[in-house]
Amino acid sequence: MTIIPSFHHFIYVFLFVMPIVFNGPVSDAAPPSVTVTEILQRTFKRVPGDKSGDAAIYPDQRHLWCNHSVGTPTVDFDGKTWRMWFVGMSMTDNPEIPYGFAARLGLATSNDGIHWNIANEGQPILDFGSPGKFDDVGLSHPFVLRVDDHYMMWYGGIDGRTGKDVGVGPAHVRVEQIGLAISRDGVTWHRENNGNPVLSIGPQDSIDAVQVTGCHVIRKDNRFVMWYGAYNGTHTIGLATSSDGVHWHKENEGRSLRGLMGGKQLGPSVYFDGNQYLMFYNTTRPTPNGGSQWTLYSATSSDGIKWQPANHNKPLLDEAPEGNFGSADGQTGNNHAVHPTKMIFIEDAIRMGYGAEENKPSKGRRYPAGAIGLMELRIGR
């Protein structure tokens, strides 16, 4: 099968005998008592941003490190300031960097969660790791959790190896492993675990022989639970647990989650209301032109392992309106809506960020540009 290059390929989550039981995240501001059932009774709508194509963040030539594409956002709101960490990409001729795109992590801030500006004087907040480290040629897929007085960021590290080097999957697909960095202000970060991965790829017969990346983490009773993207030639979602966020154990006997739609899944975002889990995730769907799109679907679970498709098996978002940055048609652009952030609860609404891409390359670009958008659901309680 021919794999069509897309923004997803460039930037693309515990089990003991008892089921997982949480009372909800205790990191970040605790969400209001909103049930999964209430959320599923309502519909997410796009929130127009103030950048090109109604994006919230769009690649900008003023910031050379992210002038081709931005994506895989992760958002935090402390009641005053919105912060969004994201992947920024620029083209490179360095043969050691897979796909020809250099990927770094940046930060944008906002007062209202709609109008965003790149922070840190327009520079990345986390750049390539030291030579020989697991992230020495790129970074991807950040997920940030506010814990007490600091931020914890798990992210994908790229060391230049591909499927060819590990003997699994398509030869060109890059290896990714998860690292951890800590920050007090969200700008200055310190790599933990001596700059080594905290969750590594598995053996050749595992679900994550090529990639462990693109995660969502919940903290409860001094335990972290991670749903993460696993890849061994097929994208699936796995689980891991940790007492400190550094030392992780892959759960469910290293197997993928069950019951999700499609033959491949990635990009999990998980919410727990005290009784039921809700996951937003990506799988592919065919398009009328014979291509395929990665788009957002939802599922529910009573234990976080076995899932049932929700929303009548329909995507979360309708087709993008004309002129919208998320106009990928399944051929020249594959990402309709991908890698959703966690849900942010604001008054009578829930807001999320997501990535998408255009349906054709714009001037000076080899591939369609990826950008970040917003969607919102009105609770109306």
How would you name each of these model-derived features?
Residues 2-12:
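Bacterial N-terminal signal peptides that target proteins for export
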Residues 6, 21-22, 353:
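Short intrinsically disordered, low-complexity segments
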Residues 11-21:
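Bacterial N-terminal signal peptides
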